[in-house]
Amino acid sequence: GSSPCRSVIMTAKAVGVELNKKLLNLQAGEHLKPEFVKINPQHTIPTLVDNGFALWESRAIQVYLVEKYGKTDSLYPKCPKKRAVINQRLYFDMGTLYQSFANYYYPQVFAKAPADPEAFKKIEAAFEFLNTFLEGQEYAAGDSLTVADIALVASVSTFEVAGFEISKYANVNKWYENAKKVTPGWEENWAGCLEFKKYF
């Protein structure tokens, strides 16, 4: 049910690729078994294997799926400027938005640590940035749905099930409500979110 896994599932749906999903139990250390480490030495989830080609890091997988299987380039346009904005949003999602989620919530969920107010401020700052990016925008990067929207909707929906108040950020909230309607695989994403919700 993690955000990175769900972003890959939605991207696959958007390009019409049927994934043969294998679920690993991280608590039981299945990702550390030699057969998985042989595929992905970094032993991170998600990992994609496509006809013997292994790739990990969800946003890299998203781009690969679109470039290899997309009928058009609309989800990741070839125009360098459009692509640059999408990349910026993907890196923002990875290094700022989703990272703020991991830094604040994971210690509470997995180590039973108390909430860290400083880490919470980083979440608020990340949402302020996203709110600014989305000023007057229907989509996260450009004028149509891209892999940036898919990655961000996976992250933002995770904040929602964790109880974060997205509605405080008007532009994010408006974008998110639209993204729920237009993102392929949203239903599966939300089902994964609800699985994840048990941790909160």
Curated annotation (Swiss-Prot):
Pfam families, sorted: GST_C, GST_N
Protein name: Glutathione S-transferase 1-1
InterPro entries associated with the record: Glutathione-S-Trfase_C-like, Glutathione-S-Trfase_C_sf, Glutathione_S-Trfase, Glutathione_S-Trfase_N, GST_C, Thioredoxin-like_sf
Organism, scientific name: Drosophila teissieri (Fruit fly)
Taxon lineage: Eukaryota, Metazoa, Ecdysozoa, Arthropoda, Hexapoda
Residues noted as binding glutathione in the record, renumbered to the chain: S2, H43, T44, I45, E57, S58, R59
Family to which this protein belongs: Belongs to the GST superfamily. Theta family.
Keyword line: Lyase, Transferase
Start and end residues of each GST C-terminal domain: 79-200
Role noted for this protein: Conjugation of reduced glutathione to a wide number of exogenous and endogenous hydrophobic electrophiles. Has DDT dehydrochlorinase activity.
